[in-house]
Amino acid sequence: MIDFLDVQASTPDIRISVDKVGIRRMKFPIKIGDEVAILSADLYIDIPQTRKGADMSRAVESIQSVLSRPSINLESLGIEICKEALGRFNYASRVEVKINGEYYKKSNGGYDEISLYIRTKCGIDGNIENLTGLSYEAITACPCAMETTRALISKDIPDSENVLYYIPTVTHNQRNRTKLIVSNNAGKISFWDIYKVLESVQGKPLESLLKRIDEGKLVYEAHKKPKFVEDVVREVAFAAVTLLPLSDDDMVIVSSDSEESIHPHNAYASMKKRALDLKKELNL
């Protein structure tokens, strides 16, 4: 009789350590209040040069074990999965977890689609790095085209100059997806806190159902505060360091991606800075 062989534990033909091995896109539902989010997880470990492969089932078990607990804190989900995996993979020195997903938040216009992000790394040295964030689509209006059309209108209608200085004028607008991710090593910053930071700059997510007055208000408000993607990134970063309980070494990562309505390309801006560096630039 041939015994079962632990192939993964055998010595590889080529003895080189592997930095990252694991599973990708393991999907699972998780309840957030009265709604359910569908998340997708990647889990990676490193393996030494003396080991042929990783026990992939342990990656699945690590995720399932945490999800089976009676209460789950979404903000520290990545931390708990990392710790669980580090205990199961006794030959790994570090674990990395990436979680993405879509959460549909009930609103007056149906459901707001919000993308969630969790990025966690932990090691046998006890170090933990946990980043959490979200993004959603909102509307922006271009300030450059607005000032150009303001000048053009004043040439066509000279008597309008006095009024034109005080009202938003014609410009193009676009769907804009802005993402905010921050350090959250203690899991104390809620996704709702991050949402409120984005909302303070971008307003609420775009909705499928808009009645006439709501549509008018949405467009009017966007044109009252026209923004480049650069403006969006700066305003979100400023709101993050003033509204969130971030320590000096915590990271603030912001990106803004606009689907330009008058161009066949997108406009994009991003920044990645420590909270301390942002505060220094802002003289806070």
Swiss-Prot record:
| Cofactor(s) it depends on | Fe(2+)
Pfam families named in the record: GCHY-1
EC number(s) given by UniProt: 3.5.4.39
Which keywords fit this entry according to its UniProt record? Hydrolase, Iron, Metal-binding
Its UniProt pathway annotation is:
Cofactor biosynthesis; 5,6,7,8-tetrahydromethanopterin biosynthesis
What general EC class does the enzyme of this chain belong to? Answer: hydrolase
**Record-marked site positions (May be catalytically important):** C142
According to the UniProt entry, its GO molecular function terms are:
GTP cyclohydrolase I activity; GTP cyclohydrolase IV activity; iron ion binding
Keyword Chloroplast listed: no
What reaction does this enzyme carry out catalytically?
GTP + H2O = 7,8-dihydroneopterin 2',3'-cyclic phosphate + formate + diphosphate + H(+)
The cofactor binding remark recorded in the entry reads: Binds 1 Fe(2+) ion per subunit.
Which InterPro entries has this protein been placed in?
GTP_cyclohydrolase_FolE2/MptA (IPR003801), GTP_cyclohydrolase_MptA (IPR022840)
Please give the biological process terms from Gene Ontology that the record holds. Answer: tetrahydromethanopterin biosynthetic process
**Function, as annotated:** Converts GTP to 7,8-dihydro-D-neopterin 2',3'-cyclic phosphate, the first intermediate in the biosynthesis of coenzyme methanopterin.
- What's the subunit arrangement here? Homodimer.
The entry sums up its family as follows:
Belongs to the GTP cyclohydrolase IV family.
The family database entries (NCBIfam families) matched by this protein are listed as: GTP cyclohydrolase MptA (TIGR00294)
- Name the chain's protein: GTP cyclohydrolase MptA
